[in-house]
């Protein structure tokens, strides 16, 4: 072919591609500008976390109007929301799926469900980038460090305070774990995903799905927000520097959009550095939206462990010299999500949930220790550690897409556990749950119980309950505690999802969020861990859609 012919052919191909896009766009159902804006907000609030801002999918399915992919064997498959059509999409949105997507017929109106079914047949908009200068422009230092109190000015047992996300209210409740009374409710940005504690235990860092991060100082007579900064338009994770000599010096935050991680001052949140995560996946394909999922601070090196969802890469970020930043990139599996430390706190265990695997990172050697096959769509939260009577130290994860909890044997340098070495990095037992849809598992070093929720299960009774296993006899079926009934709240149309068991500092209470509809009364239900009897129900009107709960001591020390 002549050199003249090549650009003509390229232009023809580009033109045909644009024509195909135009045809696909023309085939999308009509929407008004107002409907598009309303749908965009609903998508951000309810869908982007699993399906991605660009709708390319991760934990959830690809929701582009049209997509195609070529398998390893060369086979090409195509699909898209346009192929599914409005009616089928309405049914999926309304009634959920067996893969862990909840039903939205008790959350959205019929009109909103129809609107969303039409919206996802349109080509997604690309949000703006967010630069270091944008971060600096958003930074608000409310109380400089030198003007903060120099000692604790209240009598609260700070290590037993719970930071509770009030999801739809855009607020954070600080609850006294000793008295079970709300200490303070603060503005926090939309749908706080996690709260993390400073190494000192003085500060609570929150980060929400609108990209806003705050520092809350617990030392004044009443807790107060002392600084805020925006990392981007959507984020999930932050953590401070914890290594000796660097305690609370820096804070890292990772965003879903733009796909990047940023480093700020740990006490003021002044922006310092932004690093993009765009690049190649473990399969060698370029991805435009590799979102930053979980981030943790290493206990044995001055590093953060940064998990990049779409690329399947784990990045160890050395924070000793930010001007000459050193990172180690470890290949694992797609799509990385959440995770936690093993029993020894040497290995970080992270779910690659769309690959049905758990990756174990050795933070001492800076290498991948293992990739462990699990059941469908592992979702550990931070997981849970205990010493199994038959297999020694294990780390555990539940699953969104399967009705089991997987127990994975983990290594230990303690001589008393040497006899279990042959089991390391294997799923040694699966605990049977009444259904799929688990989000969080939890135990405590002082407890004999292992707790698991199932809030994403489509069955009301399953989703409204938690399940408690006896770790001394794991052959027994779990005890079901119907949290919704125990709360004493009136029946509601919306499923009141029992979510995220969280222990108090002493390990003798377990707090469960009862997450109802925005207009329904929600609650935090507290059980005695030893007897499994109801101990207290917090039903203050301020408790609106509670989800994540983070005990200060347990979060500081990675107790789970």
UniProtKB/Swiss-Prot annotation:
<feature type="binding site">
    <location>
        <position position="237"/>
    </location>
    <ligand>
        <name>heme d1</name>
    </ligand>
</feature>
<dbReference type="InterPro" id="IPR036909">
    <property type="entry name" value="Cyt_c-like_dom_sf"/>
</dbReference>
<keyword id="KW-0408">Iron</keyword>
<feature type="binding site">
    <location>
        <position position="382"/>
    </location>
    <ligand>
        <name>heme d1</name>
    </ligand>
</feature>
<keyword id="KW-0560">Oxidoreductase</keyword>
<feature type="domain" description="Cytochrome c">
    <location>
        <begin position="30"/>
        <end position="126"/>
    </location>
</feature>
<dbReference type="GO" id="GO:0046872">
    <property type="term" value="F:metal ion binding"/>
</dbReference>
<feature type="binding site">
    <location>
        <position position="256"/>
    </location>
    <ligand>
        <name>heme d1</name>
    </ligand>
</feature>
<dbReference type="InterPro" id="IPR011048">
    <property type="entry name" value="Haem_d1_sf"/>
</dbReference>
<dbReference type="GO" id="GO:0020037">
    <property type="term" value="F:heme binding"/>
</dbReference>
<keyword id="KW-0574">Periplasm</keyword>
<dbReference type="GO" id="GO:0009055">
    <property type="term" value="F:electron transfer activity"/>
</dbReference>
<feature type="region of interest" description="Disordered">
    <location>
        <begin position="61"/>
        <end position="80"/>
    </location>
</feature>
<feature type="signal peptide">
    <location>
        <begin position="1"/>
        <end position="26"/>
    </location>
</feature>
<dbReference type="InterPro" id="IPR009056">
    <property type="entry name" value="Cyt_c-like_dom"/>
</dbReference>
<feature type="region of interest" description="N-terminal tail">
    <location>
        <begin position="27"/>
        <end position="29"/>
    </location>
</feature>
<protein>
    <recommendedName>
        <fullName>Nitrite reductase</fullName>
        <ecNumber>1.7.2.1</ecNumber>
        <ecNumber>1.7.99.1</ecNumber>
    </recommendedName>
</protein>
<dbReference type="Pfam" id="PF02239">
    <property type="entry name" value="Cytochrom_D1"/>
</dbReference>
<feature type="binding site">
    <location>
        <position position="236"/>
    </location>
    <ligand>
        <name>heme d1</name>
    </ligand>
</feature>
<dbReference type="GO" id="GO:0050421">
    <property type="term" value="F:nitrite reductase (NO-forming) activity"/>
</dbReference>
<keyword id="KW-0732">Signal</keyword>
<dbReference type="GO" id="GO:0042597">
    <property type="term" value="C:periplasmic space"/>
</dbReference>
<feature type="region of interest" description="D1-heme domain">
    <location>
        <begin position="127"/>
        <end position="560"/>
    </location>
</feature>
<keyword id="KW-0479">Metal-binding</keyword>
<feature type="binding site" description="covalent">
    <location>
        <position position="47"/>
    </location>
    <ligand>
        <name>heme c</name>
    </ligand>
</feature>
<feature type="binding site" description="axial binding residue">
    <location>
        <position position="51"/>
    </location>
    <ligand>
        <name>heme c</name>
    </ligand>
</feature>
<keyword id="KW-0249">Electron transport</keyword>
<keyword id="KW-0349">Heme</keyword>
<dbReference type="InterPro" id="IPR003143">
    <property type="entry name" value="Cyt_cd1_C_sf"/>
</dbReference>
<feature type="compositionally biased region" description="Basic and acidic residues">
    <location>
        <begin position="63"/>
        <end position="78"/>
    </location>
</feature>
<keyword id="KW-0813">Transport</keyword>
<feature type="binding site" description="proximal binding residue">
    <location>
        <position position="193"/>
    </location>
    <ligand>
        <name>heme d1</name>
    </ligand>
</feature>
<comment type="subunit">
    <text>Homodimer in solution.</text>
</comment>
<feature type="binding site">
    <location>
        <position position="500"/>
    </location>
    <ligand>
        <name>heme d1</name>
    </ligand>
</feature>
<feature type="binding site" description="axial binding residue">
    <location>
        <position position="101"/>
    </location>
    <ligand>
        <name>heme c</name>
    </ligand>
</feature>
<feature type="binding site" description="covalent">
    <location>
        <position position="50"/>
    </location>
    <ligand>
        <name>heme c</name>
    </ligand>
</feature>
<dbReference type="GO" id="GO:0050418">
    <property type="term" value="F:hydroxylamine reductase activity"/>
</dbReference>
<dbReference type="Pfam" id="PF13442">
    <property type="entry name" value="Cytochrome_CBB3"/>
</dbReference>
<feature type="binding site">
    <location>
        <position position="97"/>
    </location>
    <ligand>
        <name>heme c</name>
    </ligand>
</feature>
